Amino acid sequence: MKTLLFIYLQLLLLLSIIIGRVVKVEYLHLVVEVEPSTITESCLSDGIDGYSGSFYLNTTFAELMLKEHNNKRKLHQSCPLKWSSELFNYASQFAAEYSCSGILQHSGGKYGENLAFGYSPIGAIEAWYDEGEMYVYGSENVYNHFTAIVWNNTNSLGCAYKSCDTTTNLNALYIVCSYYPPGNVIGYSSQNVFPLNSKMVN
């Protein structure tokens, strides 16, 4: 399964290179083995206000990312996320180390992780969410950016960014979002990814 996932991700990356698009997205942390008792974990959330860590927190960016994530989750009756300084610190450290190459590689940490390059903050979330357009609810076979965003058991979020100057895109944003508990747990999507609530759709 891990080998097939790796091949799938590599094909996506190759396709994006062939198409020649600067914008790219990627998701990490597909859990292949998990005990039911470990699915519900404590919340890391402590809010945006009062952050006193070592990284600069752009509160406008943080509030926007949290709001847009929760707007998407509300459409699927998923519980709202809360901001986590621990996740923000993790995402910030990883973003700071990015070489601005345009190649997306994951941190390999214990959190769920969405990456984007060349998108605006809202554009990144829209691109991730749009992968759910053809999603078959109740399926246990598809796990992507969309399912990561709306995964009901996830309760904490931390996002960071780095501004990159490239030959094709000045001030392109590299965006990292970390999620906890990580979603996309094989065998649990039907319990965590719910259909659109028709009452919430305009």
Curated annotation (Swiss-Prot):
GO terms for biological process: sexual reproduction. Secreted protein that acts as a virulence factor during infections. The keyword DNA-binding does not apply. Belongs to the CRISP family. Induction: Expression is higher in white cells. Glycans are attached at residues 58, 152. This is Probable pathogenesis-related protein CaO19.2336. InterPro entries: Allrgn_V5/Tpx1_CS, CAP_dom, CAP_sf, CRISP-related. It is found in: Secreted. It comes from Candida albicans (strain SC5314 / ATCC MYA-2876) (Yeast). GO terms for cellular component: extracellular space. Residues 1-20 form the signal peptide. It comes from the Eukaryota. Residues 66-179 form the SCP domain. Pfam families: CAP (PF00188). Keywords: Glycoprotein, Secreted, Signal, Virulence. Gene3D superfamilies: CAP (3.40.33.10).
